[in-house]
Amino acid sequence: MNPIDPQVAPWEHPGAAPETPCTNCYCKKCCFHCPVCFTKKALGISYGRKRRGRKSAVHSTNNQDPVRQQSLPKRSRIQNSQEESQEEVEAETTSGGRPRQQDSSVSSGRTSGTSSSGYTRPFKTSSGSSGSACKH
C-alpha cells in the first residue's frame, strides 16, 4: 500500500475521484456513483441556496376571503321563489301541458364505450430518459 502524502489534499489522492464525471441522471447506478452523488441524489441533501416558499400576507391573519355574515333579506327570497315558479308554469304551458322528458343517457351523463376516468398514461419514447448524458 502506498503511503499517503500529507502535502496532497484528500480529494486529490489517486483513486479518490471517480473515473467518470458526475451526471444529472438519477438512476440507481448514477446515485451510487460517488459519495457526492449519493448525498445529492440518493439522500437529497443539498447545501445550496434554499428555495423560497410563498410568503403569506403580513397584515392578514388568514388568507381567506371574508364570508358574508348576513343572509338574504326575506323579501328577496320570496321574490326569487315566485320568479322560479312562474318560469316553471311558463315552461309547462309552452310544451303542451306536460313537462318535457330528457333522454336517460343524456341526463345521466353516460356515453357508451368510454372509460369513466378518461385518464391515459403518457407514452414513453424509446429514446430513454430525458436526454441526459448517462449511458449504461
Swiss-Prot record:
Alphabetical list of InterPro entries matching this protein: IV_Tat, Tat_dom_sf
Keywords tagged on the record: Activator, Host nucleus, Host-virus interaction, RNA-binding, Transcription, Transcription regulation
This protein's GO CC annotations: host cell nucleolus
Pfam families, per the entry: Tat
Region described as Disordered: spans on this chain: 48-136
UniProt motif (Nuclear localization signal, and RNA-binding (TAR)) ranges: 49-55
Chain intervals with Low complexity compositional bias: 104-120
Biased composition (Polar residues): 58-73, 123-136
Assigned protein family: Belongs to the lentiviruses Tat family.
Name listed for the protein in its UniProt record: Protein Tat
Lineage of the organism: Viruses, Riboviria, Pararnavirae, Artverviricota, Revtraviricetes
